């Protein structure tokens, strides 16, 4: 649940902590988890403004569907999926759909785990190029969250901006 507060991309995270509780769980491990989430959010500050909802509806009254958040800026991406139900569920999507990549953009994205401690997600191969139009069917165990960072598999396709130098200062503008 802590990761959800950060991967949703709101940019504003209010944390109300109970120090004795934080210290008592796994020998204070939650403090490390908070630090890891803060570092992740800082690392992805350039892509998180695009964060948007993906997947189903966790509040539909009859079943809890897989849902999450995704963002993409042409060079980087984030994808987080959550299964709030108690049983394993599958979710089928393309990276184009999840990341809301425009139709005129083609290519592949390489996804890797966002956090050090995270199981492999069944149906998604990390560290290899995945075409944005390839259909993926993933299976999330009950009560789970998976978060991934993505980069364009072909760096020559990443939009870039030329940074000039200001006259006589040598300082980048």
Residue ranges and their predicted role:
Residues 1-119, 133-137, 141-142, 146:
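Active-site-proximal substrate-binding groove within the catalytic cores of carbohydrate-active enzymes
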Residues 122-173:
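C-terminal beta-strand-rich structural cap/linker in extracellular carbohydrate-active enzymes
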């Amino acid at each position: 649940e802590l990761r959800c507060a950060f991967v949703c991309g709101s940019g504003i995270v209010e944390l109300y902590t109970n120090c004795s509780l934080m210290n008592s769980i796994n020998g204070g491990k939650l403090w490390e988890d908070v630090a890891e989430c803060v570092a992740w959010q800082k690392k992805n500050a350039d892509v998180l403004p695009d964060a948007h909802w993906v997947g189903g509806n966790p509040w539909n009254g009859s079943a809890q569907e897989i849902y999450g958040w995704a963002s993409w800026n042409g060079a980087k991406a984030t994808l987080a999926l959550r299964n709030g139900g108690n049983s394993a569920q599958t979710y089928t999507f393309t990276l184009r759909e999840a990341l809301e990549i425009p139709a005129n953009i083609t290519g592949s994205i390489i996804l890797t785990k966002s956090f050090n401690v995270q199981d492999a997600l069944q149906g998604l191969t990390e560290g290899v190029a995945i075409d944005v139009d390839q259909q993926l069917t993933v299976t999330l165990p009950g009560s789970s969250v998976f978060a991934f960072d993505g980069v364009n598999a072909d760096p020559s396709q990443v939009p870039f901006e030329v940074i000039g130098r200001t006259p006589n200062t040598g300082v980048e503008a």
